Amino acid sequence: MTRDAVICEPVRTPIGRYGGMFASLTAVELGVAALKGLLERTGVAPEQVQDVILGHCYPNSEAPAIGRVVALDAGLPVTVPGMQVDRRCGSGLQAVIQACLQVRSGDNDLVVAGGAESMSNVAFYSTDMRWGGARGGVQIHDGLARGRTTAGGQFYPVPGGMLETAENLRREYCITRAEQDELAVRSHQSAVAAQRSGVLAEEIIPVTVTSRKGETVIDTDEHPRADTTVEALAKLKPVLLKQDPDATVTAGNSSGQNDAASMCIVTTAEKAAELGLRPLVRMVSWGSAGVAPDVMGIGPVPATEAALAKAGLQLGDIDLIELNEAFAAQALAVMKEWKFGEADFERTNVRGSGISLGHPVGATGGRMLATLARELDHRQARYGLETMCIGGGQGLAAVFERVAA
């Protein structure tokens, strides 16, 4: 018998810029801060957690199966298992989906799910050294950059990385530079307004950073820019301009490389009532889809179609949409496929997204859920959609329904 899986207290750390305020912290340390904060907020005893599932896109052997390592370092009993999920940019959402499946099936009653990423600390590596590669020289790869060009495997190479995929969509959907910059400014304005109103503070677990100067408690996102303007963004040079004179994708209309962690409790309504937890949403359905790797940014379209079909809903039934902004060109391409008009911006990324808040890839899905669930609650709306594109040519989507208090 299938049970409903509900989401309680989705939270996240502040989001740090690349090489910014969290550069000294590992993904594990960010995850530990988020998990401890979640348990403190909810009063859930560590031994009541039956699994810890974390999305993580840039792992190394310092923290294998990061869900388990974070659980142990956060002080959970050794009897609490944990694992790592990697569906690239969709990893955090996939972790939540996996937790919902475990709860729905009856295998677990309470699971912690989310993600953690420190893009500032992604490792450099070599595949040449173990068997005497030094004889002919050793090649060192930047793990952060390498994964973006190899995600299509042997037969679908994308030498220009994710930037190339955004330019491909820009070209296919006739998206102008001005449209991209306008979306980027709108994103920053939404995020800054949410910061100033205190809305984002509800989902944030403060993090303490220790340095030679002492301890600093950080409770605010670092990436949003209050001074961003279309005029300022127009001055930025497209990253692939040398390869493509028509290129339009810049650092200003792309998502950031960021550091953060996100967590939530996935359980049943009955267990939530027993523990005094308040469910915000339940997962209605989810869907994943594959697309050509060189246009990976269009992935949310078929993934959303699959999720909506399972839910018996249309896009018009959705009150709030979290569509991750990997690139402005990519987000606009999806919106064009959805035939969005100006009014649809009033329900899409209403508190900012990847361009403004940042995109700490493994943690992004949990960040989006924290915003979506709370915004549904604030507005007393019914349905929310969370969806993102995925490097390598995928899309992931999930439909959530607000749980009445």
Each language-model region and where it sits:
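Condensing-enzyme catalytic core mediating Claisen C-C bond formation in acyl metabolism
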Residues: 1-25, 171, 229-298, 302, ...
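Conserved beta-ketoacyl condensing-enzyme motif
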Residues: 23-111, 116-135, 204-220, 315-334, ...
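Active-site-proximal alpha-helical scaffold in enzymes
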Residues: 87-117, 170-199, 263-270, 335-336, ...
